Amino acid sequence: DMGASVMMPIIFTLLGLIMGAKFGEALRAGMTFGVGFLGLNTIIGLMSATISPVATALVENLNFKLTAIDIGWATGSAIAWSTEAVPFVFIAVIITNILMILLGWTKTMDVDIWNYWHVLFSASAILLACGVNNVLAWVFAIGQAMVLMGITFIMADYSQADYAEVFGLEGISIPHCQTVSILLYTYPIDWLLNKIPGVKDIHWTSEGIAEKLGLLGEPIMMGFIIGGFLAALAHFTTHGVSIAAAIQQIFIVGMNVAAVLVLIPRMVSLLMEGLMPISEMTQAFLEKRFPGRELYIGLDSAVATGHTFVISLGLIAIPIVLILAVVLPWNVVLPLGDLATLPFFAVPCVVASKGNLFRGIIEMIVI
């Protein structure tokens, strides 16, 4: 009930103490991480509050004739954490992680327990389909959760070097089921793009764009332009909205998105300031007792949203996703609830493309 912003400092303080840190050092690191985590979630909340009305207006104005509505991850996670499967799957996943670490099958120590909701949801769906009184259904539900999280831990290890290179997340992996599942597509797509003559030579990096565009290539201006464009697209197509009101919304949304692109990297930096001492203590603890062993701290993909292209790509994808929803045959789902969280879908695209916006856009369209 206290939420991640309270529990994470407690977890990291205890972890620091276990690793041999003094109480003051462990508490400072845990509190700093908690403040950064709370700040990061606050800014992400600002982004969602800003973009959700814009996305809703776009959907309403385009008058889509789709029969099912995307209700978003928040509803899905709330459902997942409220079923009979929770205690059994939760314990099974923790045991799986511990066993895999002890056996040397993974280097990821997953402390991002809130995102267990993915496997909780799939386990609950199995029980709903087969019945909670079916013993085989329980075996399958728990078994699939353990296998899925096992694959997630392995993929988190595999992608860790890329997260360190692109986002500077040293000693951190992302055992996030959604992110890992998308990486299974973006890595092969990036490999294929690297084989196409001409395409493989296109590199749109944040540094290159900033150099070519000057002021317009800076995060604050990119945020204002992208946010303003989306607001214009939404409000100038709304019947009965005055030009003055539309222009007002363009500036409001533009400034809010600009603030998001500037503030998120700073919150991630504060989060990392608290995390790095714990990570270093963990590595020192392992080196002393298990020479040659390495351990990554598994966190939510939110810590990777500090890269300018993650937010930018997620926002650019909103109109693309809406167009695809209409033109793709047999699609009946109206994208809505998760439109504001598309930057989280952009994370594995930026990772696989090594921060190349051109490839990231292609990968985002495909997934």
Enumerate the predicted regions with their spans.
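Signature of multi-pass transmembrane helix bundles
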Residues: 1-43, 84-296, 300, 304-308, ...
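A short glycine-/small-residue-rich loop at the edge of a beta-strand within enzyme catalytic domains
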Residues: 49, 73, 262, 266, ...
